């Protein structure tokens, strides 16, 4: 744990609090900004039912409803995935009017399709929210529903956010829930789950070959394994290069790459029925997997395509506080100042 003086020193390090010139033209949250969303539609290559095929690596992006099994066939064709990573919308504007019963029924439909599209031995990861002001829904009923599905539960992972929403009468909410299930008996690459956090706790002595050794000597790595509580994943916010403005609750590239590294091999097919900001697509590209992804919204399909093209062209993971449609729509959607102080900078200085 860093001392207060160390945190201050890190916060004042060159580049951390430096107000470097940053493109400050973000898109507003698209699920609650219908006017902006409508402006972006003419620039989208896909319409409902359309499929974009990547000629270089074989990735495919389809504009379809994840709960429509017939439409999904146009995305996967004869492919079978060894890994599925789903981040279904659970707190976006479009779902605020759905009852929990309707939401779970919708989840059952795309999960049934997912099971059929997975290989005999495959892994499934689902990101889901747990609203502590609403009986921990939809996570609570989702987990009960999964007990009736043919998947086998393997782990309940918590990702710790650096920021959260708090109250004077409750614990601050800083967790994200990630459920891990399997079909059959898929391999698990332990090397893929090692973090960059160095091992500092010594002890746990054990005699091996007549020699008394402690745990660090016996380990094959000088860093710790992730376990099922991840504290080393930086929550995406506007000053990160990977930020894709307009995409609410964007998942970090690092956590997605960790999942792909642990639960698939190079050349495998990775399935994602909720493309959103294109994080799974980009992670698969970087780790030499083939991604089959979809989104019901043509705008998010286009953002995913452009993010892949942007990465190949520039090596950058996102647009920071700019956006994917600036060539077509250069006008500012935000009145924030380029000189606004970065409130996250001090939070970034702490490891946890």
Language-model-detected regions and their locations in the chain:
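Core catalytic lobe of class I
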Residues: 1-32, 38-294, 298-302, 351-352
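S-adenosyl-L-methionine
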Residues: 50-73, 311-340
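Conserved hydrophobic residues forming the short capping helix/wall of the S-adenosyl-L-methionine
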Residues: 146, 308, 312
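Short functional hotspots where side chains directly engage DNA or cofactors
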Residues: 303, 307
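C-terminal cap/substrate-recognition subdomain and adjoining C-terminal extension
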Residues: 341-342, 346, 352
């Amino acid at each position: 744990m860093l001392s207060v003086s160390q945190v201050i020193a890190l916060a004042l390090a060159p580049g951390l609090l430096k107000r470097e010139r940053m493109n400050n033209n973000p898109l507003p949250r698209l699920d609650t900004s219908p006017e902006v969303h409508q402006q972006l539609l003419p620039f989208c290559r896909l319409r409902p039912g359309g499929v974009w095929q990547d000629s270089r690596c074989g990735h495919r992006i389809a504009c379809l409803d994840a709960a429509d099994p017939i439409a999904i066939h146009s995305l996967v064709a004869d492919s079978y995935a060894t890994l599925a990573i789903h981040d279904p919308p659970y707190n976006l504007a479009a779902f605020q009017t759905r009852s929990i019963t309707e939401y779970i029924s919708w989840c059952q439909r795309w999960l049934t399709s997912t099971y059929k599209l997975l290989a005999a031995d495959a892994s499934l990861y689902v990101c889901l929210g747990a609203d502590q002001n609403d009986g921990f829904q939809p996570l609570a009923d989702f987990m009960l529903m999964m007990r009736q599905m043919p998947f086998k539960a393997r782990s309940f992972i918590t990702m710790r956010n650096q920021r959260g929403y708090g109250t004077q009468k409750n614990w601050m909410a800083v967790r994200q829930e990630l459920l891990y299930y399997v079909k059959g008996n898929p391999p698990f690459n332990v090397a893929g789950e090692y973090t960059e956090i160095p091992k500092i706790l010594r002890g746990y002595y054990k005699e091996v070959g007549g020699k008394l050794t402690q745990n660090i000597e016996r380990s094959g790595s000088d860093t710790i394994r992730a376990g099922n509580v991840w504290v080393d994943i930086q929550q995406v916010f506007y000053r990160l290069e990977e930020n894709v403005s307009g995409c609410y609750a964007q998942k970090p590239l690092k956590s997605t790459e960790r999942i792909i590294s642990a639960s698939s091999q190079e050349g495998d097919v990775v399935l994602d029925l909720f493309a959103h900001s294109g994080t799974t697509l980009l992670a698969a590209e970087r780790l030499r997997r083939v991604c089959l992804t979809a989104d019901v919204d043509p705008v998010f399909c286009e953002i995913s395509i452009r993010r892949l093209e942007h990465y190949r062209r520039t090596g950058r993971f996102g647009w920071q506080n700019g956006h994917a449609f600036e060539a077509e729509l250069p006008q500012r959607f935000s009145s924030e100042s380029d000189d606004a102080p970065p409130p996250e900078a001090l939070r970034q200085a702490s490891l946890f």
